[in-house]
Amino acid sequence: MSTSSHTVLLIQTSPRLDSRTWGDYESVTDALDALCKMFEDFLSKKSAAPVTYDVSQVYEFLDKLSDVSMMIFNRETGQYIGRTRAWIKQQVYEMMRGRCQHPEGGEKVIVGY
């Protein structure tokens, strides 16, 4: 499946049904970026200083969501394929590893607002 496939990100932030929301993206990468941006916005509300985080903190954030999934368009079948929280976490890890490798082996991101 191509990372440039149309992707719908589905999120439920709390047990309340009215906390459900979704986003429409041109690619899996765009949807993952939006999810990480949501996490960064969450962190920036806690601190005015630049924020450093690693993948384990993103995982914790994702685990606290009542539900998170993606529907990714498969051009070969003409259907959307559902992806779970576990799959999303693996994709976040791969994305962060590719963008932010450090000599110590950890993946860290610094965000300044």
Curated annotation (Swiss-Prot):
Result of knocking out the encoding gene: RNAi-mediated knockdown results in chromosome segregation and cell division defects in early embryos. RNAi-mediated knockdown results in defective activity of the PIWI-interacting RNA (piRNA) silencing pathway. RNAi-mediated knockdown disrupts the localization of tofu-6 to the perinuclear region of the germline. RNAi-mediated knockdown results in larger tofu-6- and pid-3-expressing foci. RNAi-mediated knockdown results in decreased expression of tost-1 in the germline and in embryos.
Keywords: Cell cycle, Cell division, Chromosome partition, Cytoplasm, Nucleus, RNA-mediated gene silencing
PANTHER family reported for this sequence: ENHANCER OF RUDIMENTARY ERH, ENHANCER OF RUDIMENTARY HOMOLOG 2
Gene Ontology cellular component annotations, sorted alphabetically: cytoplasm; nucleus; perinuclear region of cytoplasm; RNA cap binding complex
Main location: cytoplasm
Function recorded in the entry: Required for chromosome segregation and cell division in early embryos. Component of the pid-1 and tost-1 variants of the PETISCO complexes, which have roles in the biogenesis of a class of 21 nucleotide PIWI-interacting RNAs (piRNAs) that possess a uracil residue at the 5'-end (also called 21U-RNAs) and embryogenesis, respectively. Within the tost-1 variant of the PETISCO complex binds to splice leader SL1 RNA fragments to possibly play a role in their processing. Promotes the biogenesis of 21U-RNAs.
Expressing tissues: Expressed in the germline (at protein level).
InterPro entries reported for this sequence: EHR_sf, ERH
Self-association and partners: May form a homodimer. Component of the pid-1 variant of the PETISCO complex (also called the pid-3, erh-2, tofu-6, and ife-3 small RNA complex) containing at least pid-1, tofu-6, ife-3, pid-3, and erh-2, which is required for the biogenesis of a class of 21 nucleotide PIWI-interacting RNAs (piRNAs) that possess a uracil residue at the 5'-end (also called 21U-RNAs). Within the complex interacts with pid-1.
Organism ancestry: Eukaryota, Metazoa, Ecdysozoa, Nematoda, Chromadorea
Example of a GO biological process term: chromosome segregation
Location of the protein in the cell: Cytoplasm; Cytoplasm, Perinuclear region; Nucleus
Gene3D superfamilies per record: Enhancer of rudimentary
Protein name: Enhancer of rudimentary homolog 2
Similarity comment: family membership: Belongs to the E(R) family.
Highest taxon of source: Eukaryota
Species assigned in the record: Caenorhabditis elegans
